[in-house]
Structure formats: C-alpha cells, structure tokens
Amino acid sequence: MNCVVCSGRATNRNYGAMSCFACKMFFHRTVYKNLLFRCKRIQNCTIHFKIFPKCRACRFQKCLIVGMTLAPLNDGIVSIGNQSDYSYAKLLDDLKFKNDKNYSHFVNFYSLEDPSLADILKDRGIMKLVKRTPKTLNDVDQWSIMMAYSRISYFLDFNFIRDLDSSDKNTLFKYNISRAGCLALAKCAFNENKPKLTFPNDVDAFPSEMYNLCGSSTAVLNQVSGQVIAKFVELKIKDEEYLLLILVMFCNPSISNDFSDKTKLALSSHQQAFCSALFRYCQINYSKSAPTRFTELLSLFGIVNKSVDNMNNLSMMLQFCEPKFQFKRIMQDLFSNSLL
C-alpha cells in the first residue's frame, strides 16, 4: 500500500493515515516543534498529488487533508469522530443552519454605523442592525459593510474561533474576510446564473467610481468579477462543498508566522476535520473519482486569491486617483491587509 501523503511505500497507519516513515516523522516534527512553512505557489504544489510534495507547506497541508492528527477537537460542531454517517450528516446540517441564519441577517438588515474590524471583533453589537424596508437605501457601501459583517459573524459563531487570542483573531479575519465574501457572492451568482458578482437587488459589487476610473476598460472589472464564478460553473460546486470549502480556507494556520502555538494548533486540527469531511462528501457522491474531485475543489483557492488581489489593487488605485472617495472603515481595514 502506498503512503497517502507522498505515494511512497507505506509502513503503517500513523497518526490516523497510512503513511511512510518519512512522512510520519515529518508530521511529528512539524506539530511538536510548532514549525510554520509558507508555500510560494499559493498552495498549488501538490494539486495533482502525483509527485512527492517537496514544498514543506504543501506536504504538511496534505498530511492534514488525509486525516493525520495529534490533537483532539474541542468544538461540538466539528467533532465528527470516526466520520460516522450520523455525525457527518449532523455536521452538514449544522453548517447549513448556521449559513441560512447568517444569510437571512445579511439580506434583511442594514446598519448606519461605521466601525473598524477591531471594533466588530470586540463587540458585534456595535453594528446596531436595523430591519430593512422597501425604502432602505440600496447602495454598494451598505451591502459591502453588511457582507463583511455577516462573514465575521458567521465565523465568530464557532467557539474555537471566538476564543482565539485577539491579535491572532484580527490577523485571521483581516486576511480571510475578503476571500470569504468573494466566495459567498460567487456562490450566489452561480445559484442565480449571473455572470458577475452582485449584491442583492442587482447592486454591482464595484462602486460606480471604479467604473469611471477604468473608463472604456471595464473588461478588467468584468474579468475580476467573473473569474471565481467561472470556476463555480466549471466545477458545479454544491452547497455542501461550498460550506466546507470556506472553512478549510479560513482555518489556515500558515497565513502568519506570528500566530501563537495555541492558535496554530486550533486552526490545524479544525482544518483537518473540515478537510476530512469534504473528502468524505466526495467519496459518497463521486465514488472512485473522489480524489480528483477533492483536488479540483481545492484549486478554487488559487482563483480566489488572485481575484481578491486584483480587487485590492483596484481599490487602492481608486483611493489614490480619487482622494475624496472613502470606503467604510472596515473595508479600509480589509484593503490595507499587509499580508496581500
């Protein structure tokens, strides 16, 4: 039998997965020494899993994906144990319930407040949500801040995320919220058969000032807006796959070298759990093609990263060329992300 990490010859079942001695010791050293690696190729080194993963970041990521773990999980919603059908089904039901509740708040409420990311992480009540009416203003500013707030609220509803150190939490959310928002809008556009990212009531995801800045080159905006949707269309991503993918993306311990040991361990163990659940879904629904489907789904992250990078660059250009134009404070925090 082959090692599920590197495809070499497996020696035994180590840390929950059939693996060779080298991968067993690599995983052991990485976890116990709290090592942190960074991939230079946006975590696409092992996208086909046909060659030995020389990139240590992707090698460790593969260890987590195939189920290697040293730490017990402490959050009920992802404690899926031995992947029994009951606990697996309960996980998906819980995620659907949380997502539906979150989306309902997103489309039915608005806020006139202008808090920073740190303000919201400290106290979500600072937003002072107001019920929408037919007379409520429909503009990109309102929808942008509500999208950011709804994504923040969604992730804060997980105990292990809410309990992270405040500094680590700020870094984690600052890096991920734009990506999570991009995925959420792309999923809605895919469901509604739309070619570009829009908020409810067909409000464009980009402010009119950005179209004015681009002039006749609006094709650039359309490309940025449509590239993630195109991947959704290509893969025909299901609701369950989307819900697990956003959590696999969010629980990435490698986005910062400054995370505490506690944060790295919490993110790694929960990312492994969500990866395992996603692979389980692929096994149930795609049978023998499950590994291929799984890697195709993970390839979405590279597209999202590229799209968010382009959005951030366009936003910075707009602020430079139009000094009087001001984004909401939380959007400024996300655009100024030094990790990008």
From Swiss-Prot:
Recorded hits in InterPro entries, A to Z, give: HNF4-like_DBD, NHR-like_dom_sf, Nucl_hrmn_rcpt_lig-bd, Znf_hrmn_rcpt, Znf_NHR/GATA
GO cellular component terms, A-Z: nucleus
State where the NR C4-type zinc fingers lie: 3-23, 39-58
The main location class comes to nucleus
Localization per Swiss-Prot or TrEMBL = Nucleus
Listed SUPFAM superfamilies: Glucocorticoid receptor-like (DNA-binding domain), Nuclear receptor ligand-binding domain
Family matches, as SMART domains: HOLI, ZnF_C4
Domain NR LBD positions? 98-337
Please provide the record's keywords in A-Z order: DNA-binding, Metal-binding, Nucleus, Receptor, Transcription, Transcription regulation, Zinc, Zinc-finger
Q: Which GO terms describe its molecular function?
A: DNA-binding transcription factor activity; RNA polymerase II cis-regulatory region sequence-specific DNA binding; zinc ion binding
Alphabetical list of Pfam families matching this protein: Hormone_recep (PF00104), zf-C4 (PF00105)
Q: Which residues bind DNA?
A: 1-75
Physiological role: Orphan nuclear receptor.
Family, according to the entry, reads as follows:
Belongs to the nuclear hormone receptor family.
This one is known as Nuclear hormone receptor family member nhr-197
What is the source species?
Answer: Caenorhabditis elegans
Q: Could you read off the lineage of the organism from its UniProt record?
A: Eukaryota, Metazoa, Ecdysozoa, Nematoda, Chromadorea
The record's gene field reads: nhr-197
